[in-house]
């Protein structure tokens, strides 16, 4: 990572999360000419792999990590982001690699910790150690905004939950401590990525409509539709809790190109033009279609002490 000042710092658990959850914000911020930094906590070594061509990577941690790093580079280039790094490459008190902790499905759309935590797993890293590394980034970049997940990590993945915890601790450490290179810094705004429940359910219902079927070339046996009446993941919040919106359509091409870059993780990426409930769709390795909503939404997190002048395409909800 290279030194900058101001701007946006996004903190994510694995390669692909930056595009799936904050792609429009990153692309909009970068297009405004403001600096953007993406910090990724692990390399996704234990992720599933989509498709036969790359199936040999699944279970081969080092090979999958190297491949996903290349995917991340292409995705960030599509979003216009140049400054990026892994949390374990930032100087800390110990020399330690932070690895994907893995997960187990514990319900529909809900992840939890695996029965056995593998050696080097991110969830096993000391919280203060990881947070102080990130705090170094915040002090050196001095961003206007820090963005990460809500407290349950969007859907309960242990690395996402840990990333939220590390980010919140780092914001506090950056404010209360200096380091040998930078003075203390109080982050003005902390954002958590969320989705309004009603908007998400509308988008899920629209996935069964004619516009999506046309974009996919008809019904596909390898994909499933979500159940909008099922229990929603923790990323879904009451619509009146949304505090910030990002218009997706002006940067949709960049966001979809970023999703396509993550070929081991994301499939069936399509633009949708004829339905007001969504502007695109995709599926992960679970083969369940998901909507790209017209707006990417956020709520204010804890720790921020001020406000910023938002770029065009980003607006607070009155």
Model feature map: region roles:
Residues 1-141, 169-173, 177, 288, ...:
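Active-site rim/loop-helix segments in enzyme catalytic domains that contact anionic ligands
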């Amino acid at each position: 990572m290279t030194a900058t000042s101001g701007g946006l710092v996004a903190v994510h658990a694995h390669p692909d999360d930056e595009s799936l959850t904050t792609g429009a914000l990153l692309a909009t911020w970068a297009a405004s000419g403001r600096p953007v930094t993406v910090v990724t906590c692990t390399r996704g070594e234990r992720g599933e792999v989509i498709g036969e061509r790359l199936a040999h990577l699944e279970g081969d941690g080092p090979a999958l990590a190297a491949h996903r790093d290349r995917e991340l580079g292409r995705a960030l280039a599509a979003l216009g982001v140049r400054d990026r790094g892994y949390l374990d490459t930032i100087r800390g008190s110990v020399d330690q690699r932070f690895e994907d902790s893995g997960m187990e499905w514990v319900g529909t759309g809900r992840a939890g910790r695996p029965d056995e935590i593998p050696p080097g797993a991110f969830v096993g890293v000391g919280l203060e150690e990881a947070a102080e590394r990130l705090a170094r980034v915040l002090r050196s970049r001095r961003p206007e905004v820090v963005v990460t997940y809500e407290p349950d990590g969007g859907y309960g993945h242990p690395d996402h939950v840990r990333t939220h915890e590390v980010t919140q601790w780092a914001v506090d450490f950056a404010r209360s401590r200096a380091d040998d290179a930078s003075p203390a810094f109080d982050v003005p705004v902390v954002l958590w990525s969320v989705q309004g429940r009603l908007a998400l359910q509308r988008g899920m219902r629209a996935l069964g409509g004619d516009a999506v079927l046309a974009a996919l070339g008809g019904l596909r046996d390898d994909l499933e539709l979500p159940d909008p009446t099922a229990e929603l993941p923790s990323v879904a919040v009451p619509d009146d809790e949304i505090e910030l919106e990002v218009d997706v359509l002006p940067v949709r091409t960049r966001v979809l190109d970023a999703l396509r870059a993550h070929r081991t993780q994301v499939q069936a990426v399509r633009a949708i033009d004829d339905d007001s409930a969504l502007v695109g769709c995709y599926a992960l390795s679970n083969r369940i279609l998901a909507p790209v909503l017209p707006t990417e939404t956020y709520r204010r997190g804890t720790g921020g002490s001020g406000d910023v002048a938002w770029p065009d395409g980003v607006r607070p909800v009155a």
